Swiss-Prot record:
The keyword Repeat applies. GO terms for biological process: formation of cytoplasmic translation initiation complex. This is Eukaryotic translation initiation factor 3 subunit I. It is found in: Cytoplasm. GO terms for molecular function: RNA binding; translation initiation factor activity. GO terms for cellular component: eukaryotic 43S preinitiation complex; eukaryotic 48S preinitiation complex; eukaryotic translation initiation factor 3 complex, eIF3e; eukaryotic translation initiation factor 3 complex, eIF3m; nuclear periphery. It comes from Aspergillus clavatus (strain ATCC 1007 / CBS 513.65 / DSM 816 / NCTC 3887 / NRRL 1 / QM 1276 / 107). Keywords: Cytoplasm, Initiation factor, Protein biosynthesis, Repeat, WD repeat.
Length: 340
């Protein structure tokens, strides 16, 4: 598995995202730049410039017409993917830590930071696609159609469950909440991770019936979207920043490493800066992929399950296209199932 090294950022990566077709990869970092890449060969398509602060988060609409970014300049920006122009700016009182389109692309949620007397919130906007040809995209709602305030512990990450039925949020105190996607009412709250160990990432399975969380408590959990039941736990030996569920094979990929500020002059091996592959069902670690010389801040997997990408504190995005042995790998029990 030879990685493709994408070098377009001067500072550490915050989030990377494949579009639904998997032909494009978007990356955002602390250097105020959004990059778009061809995922097949790592060629850079272009950049989206306009933010005045570090960009924390990115998401692309299911039809790849719009791109949303959230930044430390207290704005969410909506971009025309094709032309690179900014079609809408929403201002907030604090930084925006996560944006996510609903599964049908009709709504966009934004998670805002708790700071300067403002409570952390999740704002939901209705999204308009103009004539569907990528024109008239400027005509967007000014105000959110729904606002959820996190009075207990601020939300750090959030996403949509199947059909946009629930909004699932991960919190600073290690808990996971389920809100009604239409009314914003809190339905469920579960202490999924150790208390006061922040949840750094939430990513959903392809059908969005379950999701995986990555936490500072050195573990990742597979949780049901319907009732927040904890289905599986993947224990690592380092704080985790990101986790994703692979299609095609029953694996999960975890990314982490010793926190950037705790890294002294250790060797890359001691810092544990590797992508870890675990078996989704059996919870065993099955392999690691080295390469970054700093913690992995974000991982995402190609929607066809043929490749994965990781973005690190070192400012590089690495795209790995899986080889045949990856797809051939099976546990004995899985082989027996196939023989039947």
């Amino acid at each position: 598995m030879r990685p493709i090294l994408l070098s377009g950022h001067e500072r550490s990566l915050n989030q990377i995202k494949f579009n639904r077709d998997g032909d494009l990869l978007f990356s955002v970092s602390k250097d105020k730049v959004v990059c778009a890449w061809w995922s097949a060969n790592g060629e850079r398509l272009g950049t989206y410039t306009g933010h005045q602060g570090a960009i924390w988060t990115v998401d692309v609409s299911p039809n790849t017409v719009l791109l949303a970014t959230g930044s430390a300049d207290n704005t969410v920006r909506l971009w025309n993917v094709k032309t690179g122009e900014c079609v809408k700016v929403w201002d907030f009182p604090t930084a925006v830590k996560r944006v996510a389109f609903s599964p049908d692309g009709s709504k966009l949620l934004a998670v805002t930071e708790k700071r300067m007397g403002f409570l952390g919130t999740i704002a939901v906007f209705d999204i308009n696609y103009g004539n569907g040809q990528g024109e008239d995209l400027e005509n967007q709602a000014e105000e959110p159609s729904l606002r959820i305030t996190c009075s207990e512990s601020k939300a750090t990450v959030a996403g949509w469950s199947y059909l946009g039925k629930y909004i699932i949020a991960g919190h600073e105190d290690g808990s996971v909440s389920q809100y009604d996607g239409k009314t914003g009412e809190q339905l469920e709250n579960v202490q999924a991770h150790e208390f006061d160990h922040q949840i750094n990432d939430i990513q959903f399975s392809q059908d969005r019936t379950c999701f995986i969380t990555a936490s500072k408590d050195k573990s990742a959990k597979l949780i049901s979207s319907r009732n927040l039941a904890i289905l599986k736990t993947y224990v690592a030996d380092t704080p985790l920043n990101s986790a994703t569920i692979t299609p095609k094979k029953d694996f999960v990929i975890l990314g982490g490493g010793q926190a950037a500020m705790d890294v002294t002059t250790t060797s890359a091996r001691q810092g544990k800066f590797e992508a870890r592959f675990y078996h989704k069902v059996f919870e065993d670690e099955i392999g690691r992929v080295k390469g970054h010389f700093g913690p992995l801040n974000t991982v995402d997997v190609h929607p066809n399950g043929t490749a994965y990408a990781s973005g690190g504190e070192d400012g590089y995005v690495r795209v790995h296209h899986f080889d045949k042995p990856y797809f051939d790998f099976m546990y004995e029990v899985e082989r027996e199932q196939l023989r039947k």
